[in-house]
Amino acid sequence: NYYYFFNQRGNVYAPLRFSPSKELDFFIKSNPKILFLRDPRDVAVSAFHSFGKTHPLPKSSKSRKVFLERRKRMNHLGINKFSLEFLREIVMPVYKEYAQFKKENHNLIYIKYEDFALDVKGTIDSIISFLKLRVNNYDLENLVNKASPITEKINTNSHKRSGKPNQYFESLDKELIDFISNEYSDVLSELNFDLINWKL
């Protein structure tokens, strides 16, 4: 049934897993867009467990050596110091661009991972409506059943640990959560992520 989902030419059906770029301006402005983001604090927690614990090792010896050195440093830092460094240097500069991208683009549906995880069917229905797709109930139910990102139990040895939203509550120190919420309040607010302040 792919014929009613996809055009054979003229469109790109793929995630853009990097910051918006000027080279893509024309494409971005002239086509409908799905902006799908996870809470950056959970991104940091997930990165720590993935790259620090469970991510498969690269096959080449040179890449494996670099990877293991990075993994050793991450575990030495611990989850709090790593998360702050990772957010400052990698995640939040990109999310700042995405926040601006969201403000400037109208032909766009913005979806938070957290909303998707808690309401898979409702989120998929919204995407179908936004893209004006025709999807029969059988295909829709199949997609919903396969798409849920949440696992029943947290498996610390699995690359996919749990998929549950707001894991940073349990993983990061309260003081760090407050600091991140204050330092990046503009970006978090624009992207509709909660501003947590434990002192209130």
Language-model features: locations:
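Alpha-helical scaffold elements adjacent to nucleotide-binding pockets in ATP/GTP-utilizing enzyme cores
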Residues: 43-47, 123-127, 143
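Short acidic alpha-helix initiation/capping motifs at coil-to-helix transition points
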Residues: 21-22, 116-123, 157-160
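PAPS-dependent sulfotransferases, especially Golgi type II membrane carbohydrate sulfotransferases
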Residues: 81-84, 99-102, 129-200
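PAPS-dependent sulfotransferase catalytic domain
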Residues: 1-70, 82-109, 175, 179-183, ...
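Short, solvent-exposed loop/helix junctions and linker helices
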Residues: 37, 117-118, 170-174
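Phosphate-binding beta-loop-alpha motif at adenosine-nucleotide cofactor sites
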Residues: 104-131
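Acidic, glycine-rich loop-and-strand cores that form catalytic or ligand-binding grooves
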Residues: 65-79, 115, 120
